[in-house]
Amino acid sequence: MSTYGKVYLVSGNKGKLAEVQSYLAHANIVVEAVKFDLPETQNSSAEKISWDKAVEAYRVVNKMPVGEPLRHGGTPVLVDDTSLEFDALCGLPGPYIKWFLDRLGVEGLLKMVKGFAAPGEKDSGAAAPAHRGANAVCIISLCHGVEEATGQPLVEQFRGVCRGALPPVPRGGVGFGWDSIFAPEAQTPAYAKTFAEMSVEEKNTLSHRAKALKMLTEYLKTHALELRGTKLVA
C-alpha cells in the first residue's frame, strides 16, 4: 500500500483547513497551511481562476523564480476556491463571492435576491422559493509538478456542487464565511439547517467541499503510481 505524504493548502482560513484536514486524514495525507496572497485572474470561469492560482502557488511554495520555467519534483499544493451561484442572478456572485461577502456581509447578500420574489410567492425558510435557489460550488486544484517533456504544469481539478437555498435571514453560529445563508437541499427535511447550524460531521457528508475532497482522495488512491517521485507519494 502506498504511503501518502504531505501537501500544502494555500489558505489562511482555519475553518477551511480543518475541513480539508479532517477529510484527507482518512487517506493518511498530512495537510499543512501556508498563507500568502495570490493574484486572481479576472475570469468568469472558476476553474480557470483556480488553475492559475494553483500554478502560481506551486511556484511560490517551491521558491521558483518568476520568469523561469517551473521544475518537477516540488512539494504539491492545493488551492480551494468556492463559488456561490444565485439562481435569481444567473449565477452571480459566482467566483466573486469573497469580494461580495467582504463588502456586503451575509445580510447584504440576502438583500440581493429579495426583489426577485414572484407576486404572491411565500417567503419561507421551510420551502425553497425559486428566487432563493442557489448552488454552492467548490473547485480544488492540485498542482503536483510539471510535465518534463512539454514544461506544462500538472494540475488536477475536482469540482463539487451542493444544491440548496438561501434562507430569509442568516441562521446558525458555527462555520465560516457564508455558511449561515446556505441551506442544502440534500437533508431531511430539505433546507432544514444551514451549514452554520450543522456539526462538522453533518457538513462533511454533503457539502460542496466534501464532494470535491472525495474526488481528490479517490484520485490520489488510484494514481499513486503516477505520483511516485513527487513529495506527495513516497
UniProtKB/Swiss-Prot annotation:
Q: Which reaction does it catalyse?
A: ITP + H2O = IMP + diphosphate + H(+); dITP + H2O = dIMP + diphosphate + H(+); XTP + H2O = XMP + diphosphate + H(+)
Q: Which cofactor does it need?
A: Mg(2+); Mn(2+)
Where is Mg(2+) bound in this sequence? Answer: E40
- Annotated membrane-spanning segments are none
Record keyword Cytoplasm present: yes
Alphabetically ordered keywords of this record: Cytoplasm, Hydrolase, Magnesium, Manganese, Metal-binding, Nucleotide metabolism, Nucleotide-binding
EC numbers listed for it are: 3.6.1.66
The record's subcellular locations are:
Cytoplasm
Cofactor: bound how, per the entry note? Binds 1 divalent metal cation per subunit; can use either Mg(2+) or Mn(2+).
Biological-process GO terms, alphabetical:
deoxyribonucleoside triphosphate catabolic process; nucleoside triphosphate catabolic process; nucleotide metabolic process
InterPro entries in UniProt: ITPase, ITPase-like_fam, RdgB/HAM1
One GO term of the cellular component aspect? cytoplasm
MF GO annotations: dITP diphosphatase activity; ITP diphosphatase activity; metal ion binding; nucleoside triphosphate diphosphatase activity; nucleotide binding; XTP diphosphatase activity
Please tell me whether the keyword Transmembrane is annotated for this protein.
no
Positions that bind ITP? 11-16, 53, 81-82, 98, 176-179, 203, 208-209
Identify one Pfam family in the record: Ham1p_like
Q: Which domain of life is it from?
A: Eukaryota
Hey, which family's this protein in?
A: Belongs to the HAM1 NTPase family.
> What job does the chain carry out?
Pyrophosphatase that hydrolyzes non-canonical purine nucleotides such as inosine triphosphate (ITP), deoxyinosine triphosphate (dITP) or xanthosine 5'-triphosphate (XTP) to their respective monophosphate derivatives. The enzyme does not distinguish between the deoxy- and ribose forms. Probably excludes non-canonical purines from RNA and DNA precursor pools, thus preventing their incorporation into RNA and DNA and avoiding chromosomal lesions.
Recorded hits in PANTHER family, A to Z, give: INOSINE TRIPHOSPHATE PYROPHOSPHATASE, INOSINE TRIPHOSPHATE PYROPHOSPHATASE/HAM1 PROTEIN
> How does it associate, per the subunit comment?
Homodimer.
Name of the featured protein: Inosine triphosphate pyrophosphatase
Please give the organism.
Leishmania major
